[in-house]
């Protein structure tokens, strides 16, 4: 039944392209992993939230200093807004992100005994945590099969003809249908890294790409 749903959504030819794409990603990025650095679960949650509209590299620079000064959830939740804003200022939208850090820290401390919940509804109930962030957290911290559609995945999926929509939820549903569930986390990381380093928004590496014959760029 799932196969027929896949075929009805993208067709036989595109379905064969999916397996070709997965094989190429396995060749190009055999050991994919998230590039956000963290030592504790709540640090990862906050890092993913901060990564919106900026780069992982920039987030890592910010969180390294932030979590060095506030090395526990209890210390972080008691930090002043002005101090936290000073740390996250390089990321843009720093006031909202600083407020979200403090709110998330206090909610985790007060409502979840300091533990990041393994629950989508609970995660999406946190400030500035949407479906994409929840998916990334569930996959990285708990091994829950999920694909968090970010700008890289959206761009790559459209260029390779997997989707035509720019709606992240639609893209997620299509990818969920055409990619085996046990590969969701792996392919999520691969697509992010492929978009970040190869199929870039500007100056993509088309000449050396083995998928250029099916690319719609």
Language model segments and positions:
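Catalytic cores of DNA base-excision repair glycosylases
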Residues: 11, 16-217
